[in-house]
Regions:
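Auxiliary Fe-S-binding modules of radical SAM enzymes
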Residues: 1, 228-303
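N-terminal [4Fe-4S]-dependent radical SAM core
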Residues: 1-48, 55-79, 303
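Active-site mouth loops of central-metabolism enzymes
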Residues: 38-41, 73-87, 146-153, 220-222
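Conserved, mostly hydrophobic/aromatic
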Residues: 49, 110, 172, 215, ...
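Conserved alpha-helical substructure of the radical SAM core
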Residues: 56-109
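Residue-level preference for long, well-ordered alpha-helices that form the structural scaffold
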Residues: 78-85, 89, 123, 189-193, ...
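Conserved AdoMet/S-adenosylmethionine-binding subsite of the radical SAM
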Residues: 98-101, 113-257
């Protein structure tokens, strides 16, 4: 018999700010110790990844939530929203810092859907504003510094700007490593180009440091051995890889099923060996990501 328990909802989810907003409008928890900052809802990439349901979820959010569409060129934009957003974000983080789930530490993750392809530099600028505003506030509890999960900017100088703003690690998620599967399952990312991501991952490793340029994959969308070969190649450039096991979200457009237990074991065992050879650690800690087994395999808790 297996006992199943669920992560307790943090106290701050029910707390209101001076503005009347709920704190969970600005921050959210994942696993036991992640603090996720999702500045806007929705994704305006040219063509959505087929496994992703982010735009299905976005329509269920409060009508006054900031949406990627509000940040389109010519819209009211970030300049109009910035001051109130940053103030409410700081107040929300103050509430979160008082809760039990972050008593030991927290993994601060800045993450969102894409702005349109021609606004990726602006997206990086918005992340800079947020990171610069909160870096001192989260520093005492923030294990690895602020982690920015973002589609890479066109302008490589934005990587230096992100670092100066307080971002410690950048995550440019390929999601699928190799063609033809990359083009099939991530048509919008494919339009930007696989090399667009890989070259910026490599450059980020020189800007932020070896082991501080990350990419994630969806395990189950391509042959495992080809994916592991790419993870090994990326590790040689100082890039750390991981994966979430495929799960079918509401709104996904998939023609495949999640991988078998044997496939999951084969991949994460292989990835743990790569990380060991290159001196890398798995992302975050075992309390955080619950759709990945990187930490369990690193700690030898899989057998």
């Amino acid at each position: 018999r297996v006992k199943v328990s669920f992560v307790k909802q943090p106290e701050y989810y029910a707390q209101r700010l001076a503005s009347g907003d709920l704190a969970q409008k600005y921050i959210s928890a994942c696993g036991y110790d992640e603090l996720n900052i999702i500045p806007w809802k929705g994704c305006l990439i040219s063509s959505v990844c087929r496994f992703c349901g982010v735009n299905s979820v976005a329509v269920k959010n409060p009508n006054d939530a900031l949406h990627a569409a509000h940040l389109r060129t010519g819209a009211l934009g970030w300049e109009a929203a910035r001051a109130s957003y940053l103030g409410n974000l700081s107040e929300s983080i103050n509430l979160a810092l008082q809760t039990e789930c972050y008593s030991e530490h927290m993994h601060v993750i800045l993450i969102s859907g894409n702005l349109p392809d021609d606004q990726l530099d602006q997206q990086a600028d918005i992340y800079c504003d947020i990171a610069a505003h909160i870096k001192g506030q989260v520093a005492p509890k923030c294990t690895e510094g602020i982690v920015a999960v973002i589609t890479p900017p066109h302008d490589l100088a934005r990587l230096y700007k992100l670092k100066q703003a307080g971002v410690a690690i950048v995550v440019f998620n390929l999601e699928v490593g190799n063609d033809p599967w990359f083009s099939k399952y991530c048509p919008g990312k494919s339009a930007l180009g696989r090399d667009f991501f890989i070259e910026r991952l490599k450059h980020a490793a020189t800007v932020f440091g070896r082991g501080k340029s990350w990419t994630n994959f969806v395990l189950g969308l391509e042959p495992v051995d080809e994916l592991l070969a790419l993870c090994e190649k990326l590790a040689g450039y100082g890039i750390v890889s991981s994966a979430n096991v495929l799960h079918v979200d509401e709104g996904s457009q998939l023609d495949c099923v999640p991988p078998t237990k044997e496939t999951v074991i084969h991949f994460f065992h292989g990835l743990a060996q790569i990380n060991l050879r290159y001196g890398f650690d798995a992302f975050y800690c075992a309390k955080a990501l619950r759709t990945s087994l990187s930490n369990e395999f690193q700690d030898g808790r899989w057998a």
